[in-house]
A protein has these predicted regions:
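Phosphate-binding and adjacent anionic-ligand microenvironments
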Residues: 1-126, 133-135, 144-149, 156-163
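Active-site beta-strand/loop architecture of penicillin-binding DD-peptidases
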Residues: 139
Length: 163
C-alpha cells in the first residue's frame, strides 16, 4: 500500500480491501468466502457493547461509584463464566483470580477494568471521557456465528445482572 498516506486511515483501509479482493478473486474466492474460511480456521468471534447513561452531577458520581465497586470487589464470575484474570489499568495491576498472584500491566494508567473469562471471552468497563456514560465492551468466541451471537447476548445479560 505504501507510506504516502500515513494519516489517511480510510484511504489506506480501502486500498487494503481492494488488494485483498483482487488477491482472493485470483483464487476464485470472494471476500465473504475468505472471511468464512478464517472463521472456520480461527473461530467465530463476536463483540458488543452495553452503555449506561447517567446525567448530571449525580450521574457522574454514580458512574465513579460503579467503577470503584468493580475495582475494589471484582466479580468472581459473569453468569457461569468465571473471571480468570482481572486487569486494573488505573492501578497498573493484573490479578490472577485463582492464585491471587499480581503482576503489572506495563501500560499507561487509564480508568479501565478488564475481565478475562474462559474460552477467549472477556468484558471491559470504562467511563466515557466526553459523555456521562459508562461503557461495557464484551467479546466471545463461538463454534458458529449463531453460537457466538447467543454467547455474546448471554454475557451481556450476565454483565447487567452483576451491576
Amino acid at each position: 500500500i505504501g507510506t504516502y498516506a500515513r494519516d489517511k486511515d480510510a484511504i489506506s483501509a480501502t486500498a487494503a480491501l481492494c488488494e485483498a479482493a483482487a488477491y482472493y478473486k485470483e483464487k476464485g474466492m470472494t471476500l465473504w468466502d475468505a472471511m468464512v474460511a478464517m472463521y472456520e480456521k480461527y473461530g467465530y468471534f463476536k463483540e458488543t457493547q452495553y452503555t449506561i447513561t447517567m446525567k448530571g452531577i449525580d450521574g457522574a458520581r454514580q458512574i465513579a461509584e460503579i467503577m470503584e465497586k468493580l475495582r475494589k470487589n471484582p466479580p468472581k464470575a459473569f453468569g457461569d463464566l468465571k473471571v480468570e484474570k482481572f486487569r486494573d489499568y488505573q492501578n497498573d495491576v493484573i490479578i490472577d483470580m485463582e492464585t491471587g498472584e499480581k503482576t503489572t500491566t506495563g501500560l499507561p494508567k487509564s480508568n479501565v477494568l478488564y475481565f478475562e473469562l474462559p474460552d477467549n471471552a472477556w468484558c471491559c468497563a470504562r467511563p466515557s471521557g466526553t459523555e456521562p456514560k459508562i461503557k461495557f465492551y464484551m467479546g466471545v468466541k463461538g463454534t458458529s456465528l449463531e453460537d457466538a451471537q447467543a454467547k455474546v447476548e448471554k454475557l451481556t445479560e450476565d454483565v447487567k445482572a452483576v451491576l
